[in-house]
Amino acid sequence: EVRPFLDVYQRSACQTRETLVSILQEHPDEISDIFRPSCVAVLRCSGCCTDESMKCTPVGKHTADIQIMRMNPRTHSSKMEVMKFMEHTACECRPRWKQGEPEGPKEPR
């Protein structure tokens, strides 16, 4: 079955979408404990821009409180806990390169 162009185009646009993020990548100082689940679903910007010089960038953010289970392997204890995760609320296509930086990827040295 062929997916219609307009559907493909709309789904690929720069927008917030549910994304799985690792708890340890988002909270790298928490490596002594085990978390369940080990990743959580949050809204993050992703998608394509109409111009390769642009990238899908968050222009609105908020902090989401998400309940997880923290387990301590040393004491064999566990508890429910609320952790904070950044969620994107709005996205825009913005220039890839900041003003003052060379346009384009840096040359390897």
UniProtKB/Swiss-Prot annotation:
It comes from the Eukaryota. One of its GO terms (biological process) is vascular endothelial growth factor receptor signaling pathway. Keywords: Disulfide bond, Growth factor, Pyrrolidone carboxylic acid, Secreted, Toxin. Signal peptide: none annotated. Gene3D superfamilies: Cystine-knot cytokines. PROSITE patterns: PDGF_1, PDGF_2. Expressed by the venom gland. It is found in: Secreted. Snake venom VEGFs may contribute to venom dispersion and prey subjugation by inducing vascular permeability and hypotension. This protein stimulates vascular endothelial cell proliferation (EC(50)=0.2 nM) in a similar manner than VR-1 and vammin. This angiogenesis probably occurs through VEGF receptor (KDR/VEGFR-2) signaling. Also induces drastic hypotension mediated by nitric oxide (NO), which is produced by VEGF-activated endothelium NO synthase. Also induces vascular permeability. Homodimer; disulfide-linked. Belongs to the PDGF/VEGF growth factor family. Snake venom VEGF subfamily. This is Snake venom vascular endothelial growth factor toxin VR-1'. It comes from Daboia siamensis.
